[in-house]
């Protein structure tokens, strides 16, 4: 990213080397020297050309032709080019690959230039600074972020974050502990990250740009932000005490302004975020709940894809933001729910019809502020402002909803802006200014006059053709125009003897001659000059129009925010009505009480197959803090846990929820430990990932947290896993005291309520039918009677010989267990009979939970049993399931041989 120019000695050396090249290549090399780390799109006529290493890289990334033409300094010039008119599609591909591109345009006039036409870089396209509609995803925001770490005089290290959505002008700051950086990056998901040397960044799939440390100077950052906002103090914005974040903001704003080649007029405010504002969601929770992305990386089915019936792209982006930022303070969520209720009562059809006609005001406004709005941006903006009264009319009465009242107020039409657009912009303007027809008639008298001259050409040519036919007697004489030869009179060879003496030959064809006359030549000069002058005048007027619209940026941003908010509320109202959701009740008591709750996404998937979803209750309170959930795989344990978390999250967002009734108390964080996956890139095994996530929960969960623990301890040996699961559940009850859903196949844990009355057993039941099994998916009190592992394995397609061998061995194991006499040595959780160890780390004697007996098995048989016990069909991909089948078949063969 060429933000720094070469020093004087370096530049002198570069100039000396450049002097041995052609003038055009000298110009290219000078510009390229200022942007060494970016691809340079060098405009030459109707193409952007790339040279040398840039050409090779672009040819490889874009699959375009690499050629070599001519030579400069005795070296063939490697080059690759793309058409100017299709540059956006190539830019989109490069940006997606994390590349930055400097756009170098011709700013001089080729007709008057001596030597190479003057060129300069007008903007730099990077992954985090996109504003063009063709380069941006419609329904997701693109953020540029700067990260800066600072150590205070007391030795306390703070990490400052500043991030900017250049396509909307939204700027945010926050400071956090270094350990929280990964969680914040996962929440914000920047497209590009700016950082200085010395900072440790967690793994994140985004472009990274390193800047010198001095770019992050706190004092310079403070001055830069004050200058950007036009204020003398940042205290009213809540920036007092922020040091590292202000340094990051300075680097961010300077970088963004440099890429755009101008000031950021639409960045007119800053919001300081505090960790205490939002319900904490770590990366594992966002992934496991599939808020906006499935576990396999898809866009659907997710909570966002289910809820996104928004009518505008602005609304979809706002909905995505709401889902990733549930609020701790219930005031705003309750205001949203009140507005949704009003919209349901009034009906949303008319409002949704009105919203569908609106353009993306948010992004058009940003392009307008950056002076790169296109003609159809302005016509779309005009039509949207015209339609605002229709939107307001669809809300008959806000019925006391402060949010709807505020939205209606913010939708006030910026009349001066609308009047200017109506007067200045043609009803259906051309796509680009250079094609003409953008400025409306009547806006400028000079332009109208030039257009009249140009547009009256047709009548003049008809009149001239009629007169010349009469004068010459040539009945098939034609007067026409083309871009190469201009105006001409065409006469066929058979009529050549009738051509008058004042005709001058302009072009010879196979069967005709083309001529020019003094009268036609004079008209040509006048008409072509008028057309060129009209286009030049129109470009001048268009640039002036953009400048005249700049004072209205704030009003347009206000309108965009109101439209996005109203669109989300309308979509949530439609979803609540269509899907039969209810308004949750928010209370001060520490409680999660859900009656007939459903998983929103799974219910939608089942409905598509005409299958009813089984609703379930979930009660968590001070007397019932942890639910031990047992039952078979595929019985619905994970679905029950996830639906509880999603209902709580939706309540904190301000949406209605998929339940007959829901009472939700204060929630500060939602944690999930669900599923099994290793982290090969990070060098962590499945069990290590599991324990790392569990450690994070145990360190940070509070009594106001909701914790989901699924199959903890399964990644290691049976006794290790059981011991860990027991200790973790006990710690959550005695120390964290969080609302906890704890799913397990360790039936020994079901005795935990004997020690902790705040724990309760529930199970998801199933019924055996012959050799098969029917899952009831209903949550019932008490522990499950068995796991139905063999039946699930049979459903998964495990070969029958394996199932028969496993069933035979299971019967033997159960008989051995029944015949065995328990001894103290086999009591896994009993305290050793020594007076020094009669208390555990929690200050209380451990509960005596009987452990399973361990019969003696042949190694081959033990391997088969362990493989079956550790099999979790809920988490298997089709490929993994197939591999598991082959592995089980091989183990079964070995077990049968051993028997």
From Swiss-Prot:
Q: Which GO terms describe its biological process?
A: mismatch repair
An annotated Gene Ontology molecular function: ATP-dependent DNA damage sensor activity
Listed under GO cellular component are: cytosol
Q: Which Pfam families match?
A: MutS_I (PF01624), MutS_II (PF05188), MutS_III (PF05192), MutS_IV (PF05190), MutS_V (PF00488)
Q: Where is this region: Disordered?
A: 1-20, 832-852
Arranged from A to Z, the UniProt key words for this protein are: ATP-binding, DNA damage, DNA repair, DNA-binding, Nucleotide-binding
Instruction: List the biased-composition ranges (Low complexity).
Output: 843-852
Top-level lineage group = Bacteria
InterPro entries assigned:
DNA_mismatch_repair_MutS, DNA_mismatch_repair_MutS-lik_N, DNA_mismatch_repair_MutS/MSH, DNA_mismatch_repair_MutS_C, DNA_mismatch_repair_MutS_clamp, DNA_mismatch_repair_MutS_core, DNA_mismatch_repair_MutS_N, DNA_mismatch_repair_MutS_sf
The UniProt record gives the binding positions of ATP as: 631-638
Q: What's this protein's function?
A: This protein is involved in the repair of mismatches in DNA. It is possible that it carries out the mismatch recognition step. This protein has a weak ATPase activity.
Stated family: Belongs to the DNA mismatch repair MutS family.
What protein is this chain from?
Answer: DNA mismatch repair protein MutS
Please name the source species.
Cupriavidus necator (strain ATCC 17699 / DSM 428 / KCTC 22496 / NCIMB 10442 / H16 / Stanier 337) (Ralstonia eutropha)
User: What is the organism lineage in this UniProt record?
Assistant: Bacteria, Pseudomonadati, Pseudomonadota, Betaproteobacteria, Burkholderiales
């Amino acid at each position: 990213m060429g933000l720094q120019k070469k020093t004087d000695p370096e530049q002198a050396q570069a100039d000396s080397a450049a002097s041995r090249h052609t003038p055009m290549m000298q110009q290219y090399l000078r510009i390229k020297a200022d942007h060494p780390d970016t691809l340079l799109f060098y405009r030459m006529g109707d193409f952007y050309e790339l040279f040398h290493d840039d050409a090779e890289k672009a040819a490889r990334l874009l699959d375009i032709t690499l050629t070599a033409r001519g030579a400069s300094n005795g070296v063939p010039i490697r080059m690759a080019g793309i058409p100017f008119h299709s540059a956006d599609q190539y830019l989109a591909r490069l940006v997606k690959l994390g590349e930055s591109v400097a756009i170098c345009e011709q700013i001089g006039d080729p007709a008057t230039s001596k030597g190479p036409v003057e060129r300069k870089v007008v903007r730099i396209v990077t992954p985090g600074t996109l504003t063009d509609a063709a380069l941006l995803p419609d329904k997701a925001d693109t953020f540029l972020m700067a990260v800066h770490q600072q150590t205070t005089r007391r030795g306390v290290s703070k990490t400052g974050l500043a991030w900017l959505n250049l396509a909307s002008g939204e700027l945010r700051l926050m400071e956090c502990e270094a350990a929280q950086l990964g969680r914040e990056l996962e929440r914000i998901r920047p497209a590009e990250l700016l950082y200085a040397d010395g900072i440790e960044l967690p793994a994140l799939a985004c472009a990274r740009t390193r800047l010198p440390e001095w770019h992050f100077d706190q004092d310079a950052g403070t001055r830069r932000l004050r200058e950007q906002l036009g204020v003398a103090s940042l205290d009213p914005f809540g920036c007092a005490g922020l040091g590292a974040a202000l340094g990051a903001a300075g680097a961010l704003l300077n970088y963004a302004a440099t890429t755009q080649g101008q000031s950021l007029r639409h960045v007119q405010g800053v919001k300081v975020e505090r960790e205490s504002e939002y319900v904490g969601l770590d990366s594992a929770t966002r992934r496991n709940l599939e808020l906006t992305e499935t576990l396999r990386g898809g866009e659907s089915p997710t909570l966002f894809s289910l809820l996104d019936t928004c009518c505008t792209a602005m609304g979809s982006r706002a909905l995505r933001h709401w889902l990733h930022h549930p609020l701790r303070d219930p005031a705003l969520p309750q205001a949203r729910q009140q507005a949704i209720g009003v919209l349901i009562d009034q009906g949303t059809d008319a409002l949704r019809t009105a919203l569908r006609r609106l353009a993306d005001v948010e992004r058009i406004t940003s392009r307008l502020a950056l002076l790169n709005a296109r003609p159809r941006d302005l016509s779309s903006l005009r039509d949207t402002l015209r339609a605002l009264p229709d939107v307001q009319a669809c809300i008959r009465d806000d019925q006391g909803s402060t949010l709807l009242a505020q939205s209606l107020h913010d939708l006030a039409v910026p009349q001066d802006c609308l009047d200017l657009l109506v007067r200045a912009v043609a009803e259906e303007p051309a796509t680009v200014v250079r094609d003409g027809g953008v400025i409306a008639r009547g806006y400028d008298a000079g332009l109208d006059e030039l257009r009249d001259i140009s547009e009256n050409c047709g009548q003049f040519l008809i009149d001239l053709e009629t007169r010349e036919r009469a004068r010459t007697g040539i009945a098939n004489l034609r007067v026409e125009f083309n871009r190469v030869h201009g105006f001409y009179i065409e006469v066929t060879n058979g009529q050549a003897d009738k051509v008058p003496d004042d005709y001058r030959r302009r072009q010879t064809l196979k069967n005709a001659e083309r001529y020019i006359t003094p009268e036609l030549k004079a008209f040509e000069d006048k008409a072509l000059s008028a057309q060129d002058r009209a286009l030049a005048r129109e470009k001048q007027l268009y640039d002036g129009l953009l400048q005249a619209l700049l004072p209205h940026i704030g009003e347009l941003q206000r309108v965009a925010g109101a439209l996005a908010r109203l669109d989300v509320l309308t979509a949530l109202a439609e979803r609540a009505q269509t899907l039969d959701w209810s308004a949750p009740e928010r209370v001060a008591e520490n409680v999660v009480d859900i009656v007939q709750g459903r998983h929103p996404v799974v219910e939608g998937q089942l409905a598509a197959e005409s299958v009813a979803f089984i609703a379930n209750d979930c009660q968590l309170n001070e007397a019932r803090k942890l639910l031990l959930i047992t039952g078979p795989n595929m019985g619905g344990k994970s679905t029950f846990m996830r639906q509880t978390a999603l209902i709580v999250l939706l309540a904190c967002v301000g949406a209605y929820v998929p339940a007959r009734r829901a009472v939700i108390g204060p929630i500060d964080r939602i944690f999930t430990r669900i599923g099994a996956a290793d982290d090969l890139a990070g060098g962590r095994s499945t069990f290590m990932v599991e324990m790392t996530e569990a450690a994070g929960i145990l360190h940070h969960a509070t009594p106001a947290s909701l914790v989901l623990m699924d199959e903890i301890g399964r990644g290691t040996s049976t006794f290790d896993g059981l011991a860990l699961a027991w200790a973790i559940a006990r710690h959550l009850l005695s120390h964290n005291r969080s609302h906890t859903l704890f799913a397990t196949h360790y039936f020994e844990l079901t005795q935990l309520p004997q020690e902790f009355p705040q724990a309760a057993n529930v199970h998801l039941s199933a019924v055996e039918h012959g050799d098969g099994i029917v899952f009831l998916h209903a949550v019932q009190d008490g522990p499950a009677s068995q796991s139905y592992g063999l039946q699930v394995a049979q459903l998964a397609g495990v070969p029958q010989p394996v199932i028969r061998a496993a069933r035979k061995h299971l019967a033997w194991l159960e008989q051995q267990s029944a015949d065995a006499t328990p001894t103290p040595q086999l009591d896994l959780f009993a305290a050793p009979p020594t007076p020094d160890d009669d208390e555990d780390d929690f200050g209380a004697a451990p509960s005596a939970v009987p452990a399973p007996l361990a019969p003696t098995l042949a190694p081959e048989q033990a391997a088969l049993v362990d493989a079956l016990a550790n099999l979790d069909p809920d988490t298997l991909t089709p490929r993994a399931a197939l591999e598991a089948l082959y592995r089980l078949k091989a183990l079964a063969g070995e077990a049968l041989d051993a028997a």
